A protein has these predicted regions:
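Boundary at the C-terminal end of the N-terminal hydrophobic targeting segment
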Residues: 11-18
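Non-catalytic tandem-repeat scaffold regions and their flanking low-complexity/translocation tails
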Residues: 18-424
Length: 424
């Protein structure tokens, strides 16, 4: 999945850092209000709703793509806010099918429909269960952001922190649990108004190292989204319904491409560097050669690797999941970094169980060698996060080449007695 880390220096919390939700913490009712947990409409209505939304929102294209997408997002969010989450997701599917150009903003749109859903410790798990892993699990992330955002300024009891995800434990599909814990990280950044240090401390209140690291990934995804809005004027991220960081929040330094990773405690640094490419690439105008050089300056070999993995994830997104575009970007970095770039790409291609075949096909398109082996190791890491039992992991690692299988099962931790993932 993704990994992130703490920010070394942030301004003290203030409502200025949470400009986009001014007044929300002054709404006590939001802390006890919830969307209905029983849908009132069925997914079969999605086609008609999608057609209606597309017709109503098309005129906004003349103003900007952001206005067009925001119009669609508002319409879908109106469905989910009323408890019709599956219908909202189905409508998003139909919209993307009708206008494939929107696939690149499918995650922000799913995030927006999730953020529209209010929940309480009693209802959060039931509402989250209506989401799934489509669109890089944006629905989960949005619901959890709203859950914590609504509680800004209130004490965060341990029961409130744990309630959303504890109901998802004990299943074979542990990816749902990862998604929830990752979403908690997003939400904690809302709660703490972009103070990553405070957010990470709350992540450390979770039960296990795996839980905590899954949470870190959400904290620093949110940090980097805030940095994009703050430094690079990325309007598209507004569809996530993120608050806008205030000018006093130091989320990134363009003259120091290793910040904030080089200013964070060692425990969080690996997660940070896995996401640092999200900040490096816009700073170097998407020049993968220059971005690779920035990764090389991370110092520690493990951190350099994580940075290259992040470059691969970005390559997959920038190429709209097209294999040729991924290879073109990854092949610009140093020869030692290319295999790890491929690993990052496949972990993005196969971000969720429903996308596993797409990642496997990418690895099979590569020639035998280090790049292909590292790609299959990346598949294994994903598989280890998707399934908790060895049988399912072995089944997912099938390939015609024994070398593929060996790399995959090693990544999945099939022969180990410890969880395959010690990080998200």
């Amino acid at each position: 999945m993704l990994g992130f880390a703490a920010i070394g220096v942030l301004a003290s919390p203030s409502f200025a850092q949470h400009e986009g939700h001014a007044g929300m913490s002054d709404m006590p009712a939001d802390t006890i209000a919830t969307a209905p947990t029983t849908p009132t409409r069925t997914v079969s209505d999605s086609a008609a709703i999608a057609d209606s939304l597309l017709s109503a929102c098309k005129p906004h294209i003349g103003h900007s793509i952001d206005a067009y997408a925001s119009c669609l997002g508002d319409g879908i969010a109106a469905l989910s806010s009323a408890g019709n989450i599956a219908l909202a997701m189905g409508t998003l599917d139909r919209i993307v099918h009708s206008d494939p150009s929107l696939i690149l903003i499918g995650h922000p749109l799913a995030h927006a429909l999730g953020y529209a859903v209010r929940s309480t410790p009693v209802t959060a798990t039931r509402l989250l269960s209506e989401c799934d892993d489509r669109y890089q699990s944006g629905c989960y992330h949005g619901i959890l952001q709203r859950y914590f955002d609504a509680r800004m300024g209130l004490p965060l009891a341990q029961s409130v922190l744990l309630a959303p995800c504890d109901g998802l434990r004990g299943t074979r599909e542990q990816f749902r649990l990862f998604d929830c814990l990752h979403g908690v990280g997003h939400g904690l950044m809302m709660y703490h108004r972009y103070d990553a240090n405070a957010s990470l401390k709350d992540c450390d209140r979770l039960a296990s190292d795996w839980d905590q690291r899954s949470c870190y990934s959400g904290v620093f995804m949110e940090n980097n989204m805030g940095a994009h809005m703050q430094m690079f004027a990325d309007e598209q991220l507004g569809m996530h319904r993120h608050s806008m960081p205030g000018p006093s929040a130091v989320l990134f330094k363009p003259n120091d491409l290793n910040y904030p990773c080089n200013a964070t405690p060692a425990r969080y640094r690996r997660e940070c560097y896995e996401l640092q490419a999200d900040l490096i690439l816009p700073a170097v105008k998407q020049d993968y050669r220059k971005a690779g050089a920035a990764c090389d300056s991370a110092g520690n070999a493990d951190l350099v690797r994580e940075c290259y993995i992040g470059l691969g994830r970005n390559a997959s997104g920038a190429a709209a999941f097209q294999y040729a575009g991924i290879k073109k970007r990854c092949d610009q970095v140093s020869p030692a970094g290319v295999p790890f770039c491929y690993e990052g790409a496949v972990r993005h291609l196969a971000y969720a169980p429903s996308e596993l075949s797409r990642g496997v096909a990418f690895c099979k398109s590569l020639p035998e060698g280090d790049g292909r082996s590292r790609c299959w190791d990346g598949v294994g890491l994903q598989v280890g996060g998707f399934f908790s039992d060895s049988t399912s992991r072995q089944r997912a690692c099938r390939s015609e080449l024994e070398s593929d299988v060996a790399a995959c099962v090693e990544g999945a931790g099939v022969a180990r007695t410890v969880p395959a993932r010690d990080r998200p």
